[in-house]
């Protein structure tokens, strides 16, 4: 027998596609509503189904078609899904429009890329709150709770059946819902836990206790009764137990709380039980302004990273109440924890994998943007003592290139790089000397040769002095000890690495987030390990590559740009004060807390050569910060600053 929703969906579909009895149709979806359409519209030319996880299988008597089969068939595609998730599915298959394939909603609305926008702002659920749930609990004598995705949840987006030990590993309680459970108990309500699950009540109790839920509530589970919530059988058992234990009056005052609108909603109501539906963390993500992250789901690491995010950010089913579905970080610590840390954390795991494969004996982290990765590395080293020792050292393009100058060829190479500013600033920033000339640095051949002829001797003399001091500093740090060394840099063209190699007369293996505009005078493309590849003006295909300057401003330490070591072995920095560091430190706190939390769960320190790294999930979380209605306010955006004194740029906002 069809439920109200199924009847409505089938009727709506039939009204708008009844004239398409000849045209091939494909339904995207394999759920109850699709089944209702197939049952009620057998006269239509429905050739098959679509579902990202079931390609090639037969569902509801129809084959789930591949993209190749769809392109050959050229049907109309109708998305059979709630309005709140239609955009996710459409974005997943929008490329098919290039093949002349049109995509529709069940009401006949043709979907198109230009017309898409986030349209869940008026979702009734955004007005639901824990206060409303408390009120509903107050009005009933008996409260039953669903277990999975209501009281406890897994830190995974999708999963097959897990082993019992893995189940424990990935489980986390939903704190607000445990508060609601305890609230009901304090109010003297009779409590039952009702679950469609393959675990016995004894096993479920063990999982609940693992999550800190120690009270011995009565559990009614499908595998012990051969009926389910889905078929209504468990609710009949619940009512029977309530009547026997508490009487008929209590039987008529049951509230069931759960997340599944069919099993916990419609089926409970059809049994005469009042309901209060909450959203699972996954449903919250699907309905929220972050839904686009689900358009291209990845593999295991995507699953784990995005799963951890939703189990944290959407742990509270009322997290978006009053926000119209828009996800926002309330402060800089939250910004660091939820949106920045996942990308850095995944990179650091990748880095460890690489240095273990490459048998690196000493890992170098260059200032300033090596500071936070260094702190994270040290935390990871506590977890894996086989990692090589790490050194954080002061360097910059200015300091290392000047110290590495030995002849006119070195000088000429450094003049090729673009500089915006005066002649005086050019010679100060590039070579560490004072020039007398006024005027703008034009970098013409005539101007360059004339000025270099004039200042070559002074440049070489200063370079020798700075080289001696800087080499003393590097020796004191233990950097030129002839170990097999790796070097972290964030996004770069290899300038620091190349000149450091010249100074210590030793090759160093570079590990970056991404390289920049390779090949260049220093390195060919591909010789530096970088999971985000080589960023060029035409290769901005990840969120990191588009917004790396913001990440760069986050990673840095408290000091201004390092200039040199003076003759008294003192570190010299660019003038001024790094006023924004205290704000960046708040982001650091959130990131480091995330790392500590993940290290409690993860065991992915591996030297496996073909480990399947997947940065798409963390990259998507990072990219959300830059959405139109984004995760942070304009006031917080103002805290992100960078400078590029080496190329003549003063402080600027990096957002």
What is each residue range found by the language model?
Residues 28-32, 52-53, 79-84, 147, ...:
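Structural motif
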Residues 239, 249, 254-257, 265-266, ...:
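Long, low-complexity, Lys/Arg-enriched
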Residues 134-166:
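Active-site neighborhood of HAD-like aspartate-dependent phosphohydrolases
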Residues 65-74, 130-136, 236-242:
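Short amphipathic alpha-helix with an adjacent loop that forms part of the alpha/beta core around
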